[in-house]
């Protein structure tokens, strides 16, 4: 990640920046934001867990009973791409609004709107309306500001040298939600446990969790961007900055390699549940257990393993091998046709991609000057969310041919991109200006 070393950011520089002393107080001040991230991702994790078996097996008659499977997986891919598509469009605007009006007002409005969207999702499932479900998913993504607010607030009160650790807590909160959300949500959607449980029940529960989180945030969270530090912003600038992905010749290849890695990784998250439902005929309760299991190595990586590897290997090496292994393990998932093997193959795939995700961003950050960090990493985040949205559509279209195809294609994409990093980008390219990628 960014390793800014500006003057005045040491122990004495904190006072010059108007920042509080480092220590437990900083974490306590930001704790409500981590709770918001956790609650938001609990809700988001339910979409993959519930929507996949629901659409493919038509448990709730959301689609016509005679709808062919090829059309079902395409519609599922479209449905799963809508939330990140909303994020792609909404996050830059919400981030700009929080710069202008403060973090807390934007976060509170976002939370209220998102809470309402989850109620709308539950209503759509109860009414068996695919159109309303799709609209609510898109609106929820547009309103989602938890990660952008958390990152901005951390930048407000934490020095650059300390930010990696505090940003890491964001990913730890999100990955923990991917364990809790599917496990609890899968059971709440199982009518065999309680007769009145159904696909809408987890989203009503998510709405209640978000409502309580909203109330707690309003009471506890203190503004980190006071009026004296706010500034007017250009909303169009957030989008025109993306031109750098094409125009920046020095970073262009790294941008597009990262996009390929992100497309493969987020495509995996959307496509392996399709494979489980089609191949092993799993219901929502069983799917939820595998989705939660995939989250376990991500938590381990964020909590410890990535840091352990980072001090022993170069960023380039970590990116290359983790991406290659991610692709190889994806193909192994569909190559071994036993349900018991999934506990191993899914774990290995998730472990590899959990290392690859932060390594991609770090590799790009180290190739960037300090003055460009914000713009370049913003572009990278936009590429990540864009790839996440596209992956659902690509996965659905490929699965319409046969359900194993998306994981095979995405696996080959990750492996090819890793080889391009190895042989297509010179070892003497900048890691930071004037430094080799291999020198870190």
Name these PLM-found stretches:
Residues 50-73, 270-286:
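Short amphipathic helix-loop junctions that connect adjacent transmembrane helices
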Residues 13-27, 222-256, 440:
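Juxtamembrane intracellular "pre-TM" segments in multi-pass secondary transporters
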Residues 38, 117, 130-145, 341-355:
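Hydrophobic core of transmembrane alpha-helices in multi-pass small-molecule transporters
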Residues 112-127, 324-337:
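C-terminal ends and interior cores of transmembrane alpha-helices
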Residues 136-174:
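Cytoplasmic helix-loop-helix junction between adjacent transmembrane helices
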Residues 89-102, 301-315, 399:
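Helix-to-loop junctions at the C-terminal end of transmembrane segments
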Residues 372-401:
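A late C-terminal transmembrane helix in Major Facilitator Superfamily
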Residues 316-360:
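C-terminal transmembrane helical hairpin of 12-TM major facilitator-type secondary transporters
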